[in-house]
Design a protein with these regions (language model features):
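Conserved AMP-binding/adenylation subdomain of ANL enzymes
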Residues: 183-200, 208-249, 263-264, 269
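Conserved pre-ATP/AMP-binding loop-to-beta segment of ANL
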Residues: 16-19, 145-164, 171, 194-200
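AMP-binding/adenylate-forming catalytic core of the ANL superfamily
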Residues: 361, 367, 386-476, 499
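Conserved AMP-binding/adenylate-forming core of the ANL superfamily
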Residues: 20-50, 55-64, 71-72, 89-94, ...
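AMP-binding/adenylate-forming catalytic domain of the ANL superfamily
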Residues: 470-494
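Conserved AMP-binding A3 loop
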Residues: 29-33, 160-184
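Conserved ATP/PPi-binding loop(s) of AMP-dependent carboxylate-activating enzymes
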Residues: 330-336, 346-377, 410-412
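Gly/Ser/Thr-rich phosphate-binding loop
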Residues: 247-252, 265-326
């Protein structure tokens, strides 16, 4: 066993009589013993069909209590789990299967029926405490060609997870995370969030994603805490789920925070249950939360927001705001990570100049599964994000280097402009893009998702322009303004800027 799998097994034994994971869809808690029994059942099944160290497993499941036990069983054998979105269409699954050599595919029931006639795989059903019917497709052709030996045991440098990057700026990259990297990341999370066995976390984020996989699930399990799993986020159920299950923290994205602020039913339920809600904090990541929403959420729901900065390549977070020393608008301070700003070939850790954020540490990858050496230099991972440190050592992220707008030689950082304009009351969300322009090369373009406002577009444009004139440099002001009902997004709520740009170009 690796250090990681040994700790996971030990926690189940320590808490074998205790409720550890609740599946809200089933309305059922599972004890450490029940979870350990499921891990053993899956371990034996996978061993019987011939899975070996570093075999690949494709997983397409909804959030549920079976996810953590499936992952642990894979890791104990050294199998590399590659989870994908539960909404992945069958055609995309088949493309993934054909491009890579998977030993097994684990899918939800709706996809199993479609997949049966599409792939030359053997279908098996495994019954567990956490899932009465877990459908597993076996690549018998691959496994039958194996020599009759038991293979090697997993070690610290073997891959445990392959995750696709969120792919908001192009084709997703495959990120491979080793047992060592995953274990290190989880313990950095435990330390920085001060997690203990007294904590209970609510998972509403998709479990194929690094946030739920490592920050919420793995870190909580290694700290001995409890996990409550929702199939997906529901504004009308959120505060009830927090209250009834004594949740002490949860990890979300700014989109969820925005919804909770404007959803009348959620606000009504909170007002009725607030005496029974004892959150230590709500963790927010993926993209920056506008200051007015940050303040409004903390004031209305009487809990702290902790913003951080991380990515799949760092196996979760690299920075986090200290629990008792938050700085609004920042991504916090480095956590178990060396973070620097690359400016003119120099790695700066002080000063306030903007440059590319680079990171290194014991939880950061050294290459992609499909090698991309240009993403690394001198032991640093080049994130492609722009940012700076303030005088107190807090990191401020200003956007992607690829998103930087070049207006006639003057550079505009979209995130900074978005942060300022989002203070306008009628703006729910705003995206600043560079659109083709014959004169300047790129035109600063604002795309606004308004709140339910009684203002007409002409009035909103006038207010936006007046506010920009008062608060932005002339070259930062938008010369084009569009209004949309919503933005194209990935499964975690990130806005897909390339798709948005294509939509605007087609108008």
């Amino acid at each position: 066993m690796t250090t990681l799998t040994k700790q996971l097994a030990e926690q189940l034994q320590i808490h074998k009589e205790d409720d550890l994971i609740k599946d809200l869809q089933l309305d059922q808690w599972f004890t450490g013993q029940q979870l350990a029994d499921d891990v053993a059942t899956l371990h034996d099944f996978f061993q019987e069909i011939g899975l070996m160290n570093q075999d690949l497993a494709l997983v397409c499941l909804d959030n549920s209590a079976v996810y953590p036990v499936l992952t642990q069983a894979f890791w104990e054998l050294g199998v590399v789990e590659h989870p994908v979105a539960a909404t992945t269409p069958i055609a995309q699954l088949l493309t993934e299967f054909n491009e890579h050599t998977y030993a097994v595919i684990v899918v939800k029931q709706e996809l199993a029926e479609q997949l049966t006639d599409q792939v030359p795989l053997q279908k098996k059903i495994v019954k567990l405490n956490t899932s009465q019917e877990l459908t597993i497709f076996i690549n018998t052709e691959l496994l039958s060609k194996r020599p009759n030996d038991t293979g090697t045991s997993p070690n610290e440098e073997d891959l445990g997870l392959i995750l696709n990057t969120s792919g908001t700026t192009g084709k997703p990259k495959r990120v491979g995370l080793t047992h060592r990297i995953l274990n290190n990341a989880a313990h950095h999370n435990i330390d920085s969030h001060k997690m203990t066995s007294a904590d209970t976390t609510l998972i509403t984020m998709p479990m194929f994603h690094i946030n739920a996989q490592v920050i919420s699930t793995l870190s909580t399990r290694l700290s001995g805490g409890k996990i409550v799993i929702a199939t997906k986020f529901s504004a009308s159920h959120f505060w009830q789920q927090i209250s009834e299950n004594h949740v002490t923290w949860t990890s979300v994205v700014p989109t969820i925070i925005s919804i909770l602020l404007i959803n009348d039913q959620a606000n009504h339920i909170y007002s009725e249950l607030k005496a029974h809600i004892h959150l230590r904090f709500v963790r927010s990541s993926s993209f920056a939360l506008p200051e007015r929403k940050f303040i409004a959420f903390q004031d209305r729901f009487h809990t702290k927001i902790l913003e951080g900065y991380g990515m799949t390549e760092t196996s979760s977070q690299s920075t986090l705001n200290p629990i008792n020393a938050q700085k609004i608008g920042s991504a916090g301070k480095p956590v178990g990570t060396d973070v620097a700003i690359l400016i003119d070939g120099k790695y700066e850790t002080k000063g306030t100049a903007i440059g590319e954020i680079v990171v290194r540490g014991d939880h950061v990858i050294s290459d992609y599964v499909d090698s991309q050496p240009n993403a690394f230099h001198d032991g640093w991972f080049l994130t492609g994000d722009l940012g700076y440190f303030d005088e107190d050592g807090y990191l401020f992220v200003k956007g992607r280097s690829k998103d930087m707008i070049n207006r006639g030689g003057e550079k505009v950082a979209p995130a900074g402009v978005q942060s300022i304009l989002s203070q306008l009351d009628f703006i729910e969300e705003i995206v600043i893009l560079g659109m083709p322009d014959d004169l300047y090369g790129e035109a600063v373009t604002a795309v606004v998702k308004p709140k339910n406002s009684l203002l007409d577009e002409a009035t909103m444009i006038a207010q936006l322009q007046d506010y920009a004139n008062e608060n932005l440099a002339k070259f930062e002001r938008s010369t084009q303004i569009y209004f949309v009902q919503d933005f194209p997004r990935n499964p975690t709520g990130k806005i897909l800027r390339p798709q948005l740009k294509k939509q605007l170009l087609s108008i």
